[in-house]
């Protein structure tokens, strides 16, 4: 009886999270705050970790983002585009530090951290072949993304061709598409917040609609590469 009750509670919470995922990632119109969304997801993960019978192929812990929209062509990421975890208290931070210590097999060592502000937008992947932008993809569900090359080409921060002499034959650049708050001020009547403005604008069917929004792009890492020489 207890198992059946737990499964029922889990299913209700999971269905609710799937609804919010669709609103957040596909409709760009969230119904709840980020903190409430994160708490609901943490509750589900805690249930999965406590009661192993809840885990399945559709486990919450394996889900990133939302399924891609049907209006875009799909493509599988060569390396999954994962999502950052978060915490809202010192307990979560201590857990993070302990995981690092265990991974490094070290104890009683003080860690030094460097940090940077997180830009809240929508993740994008840019593949360059022979220095030219060949394909642009959204994160999608982390495993499969949406091909949005023409939309990404409308962003001035994204070069269509790399001028550098020493550049790999093929490389995937990953980064964040976002909109500055002062730019968002002029279009705030159309979107709930800057993050939704970036996501909604980037996933327009017509690239010319994307061009009308002052989107920015910042790169933070690379995925796969062919011919990249790194000495350190």
Which residues does each PLM region occupy?
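RNA/tRNA-interacting regions in translation and RNA-turnover enzymes
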Residues: 1-232
């Amino acid at each position: 009886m207890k198992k059946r009750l737990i499964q029922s509670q889990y299913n209700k919470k999971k269905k609710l999270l799937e609804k919010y995922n669709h609103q957040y990632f596909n409709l760009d119109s969230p119904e709840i705050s980020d903190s409430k969304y994160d708490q609901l997801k943490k509750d589900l993960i805690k249930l999965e970790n406590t009661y192993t019978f809840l885990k399945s192929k559709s486990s919450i812990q394996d889900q990133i983002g939302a399924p891609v929209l049907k209006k875009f062509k799909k493509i599988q990421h060569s390396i999954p585009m994962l999502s950052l975890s978060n915490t809202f208290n010192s307990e979560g931070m201590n857990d993070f530090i302990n995981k690092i210590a265990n991974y490094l097999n070290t104890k009683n060592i003080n860690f030094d951290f460097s940090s940077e502000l997180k830009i809240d937008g929508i993740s994008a992947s840019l593949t360059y072949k022979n220095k030219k932008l060949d394909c642009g993809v959204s994160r999608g569900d982390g495993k499969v993304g949406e091909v949005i090359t023409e939309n990404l080409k409308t962003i001035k921060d994204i070069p269509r061709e790399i001028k550098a002499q020493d550049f790999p034959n093929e490389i995937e650049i990953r980064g964040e598409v976002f909109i500055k708050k002062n730019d968002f001020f002029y279009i705030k009547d159309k979107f709930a917040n800057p993050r939704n403005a970036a996501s909604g604008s980037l996933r327009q069917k017509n690239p010319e609609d994307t061009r009308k929004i002052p989107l920015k792009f910042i790169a933070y890492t690379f995925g796969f590469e062919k011919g990249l020489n790194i000495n350190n």
